[in-house]
Amino acid sequence: EPTGSPVIVVDRDAIVLAGTTTTTDLLRKVPQIVGLGASETASAAQNGAANVTRASGVNLRGIGSNATLLLLDGRRLPPSGTQGQLTDASVVPAIVLQRVEVVADGGSSIYGSDAVTGVVNLIPRSTFTGNESVVRFGVADSYDELQVAHIFGTSWGSGNLVIAGEYGDHSGLDGVDRSFY
């Protein structure tokens, strides 16, 4: 009997319980994702110098974000960065996600060299009706952070519409702001 690759699924209930407002924060909680490669906080990562857009690329198994394929509802997302070296997970607000599927085995035989370490598929809520907002604010010493997300959805006889977005802002925290650094 043939066996397939295991799929790690993070469903809507787990997404809500995680208490995150961004997709990148949610993906950090999946054990198979060792990092988000080049990101706004890790510019020294692989391809970090070319990441002027501050994108967050998914990094399975620590090989690099260019070896992990990121899909939105089974379709490829356009690449980010000045050299197209990664796909930005932060372009999809976490509030719109119905579930996240992670295949942490190589999928290059199906998807090509973009999926050497695996595939992450973001599945959106396509039939949401109503309004929902999430606001998170945090303060610690000389650092503060604000994250806001909202989703709106409506449906009619022949279709539906879902619009979602998120906003995040944080102050910088330099090493000199810490007395022990």
Predicted features along the sequence, with ranges:
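N-terminal periplasmic "start-of-domain" segments of outer-membrane beta-barrel proteins
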Residues: 1-20, 80, 127-134, 170
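Short strand-turn segments of transmembrane beta-barrel domains in outer membranes
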Residues: 106, 128-153, 163
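Non-catalytic regulatory/gating segments with a bias toward low-complexity or hydrophobic composition
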Residues: 15, 27, 100-101, 120-122
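Periplasmic-side early beta-strands and strand-to-turn transitions of outer-membrane beta-barrels
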Residues: 136, 158-181
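Extracytoplasmic beta-strand/coil segments of soluble accessory domains associated
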Residues: 28-76
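N-terminal periplasmic accessory domains that precede
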Residues: 25-26, 56-59, 88-90, 114-135, ...
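Short acidic/polar hinge/loop motifs at secondary-structure boundaries
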Residues: 75-104
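Short, polar/charged loop or turn motifs at beta-strand boundaries
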Residues: 5-28, 48, 57-63, 86-90, ...
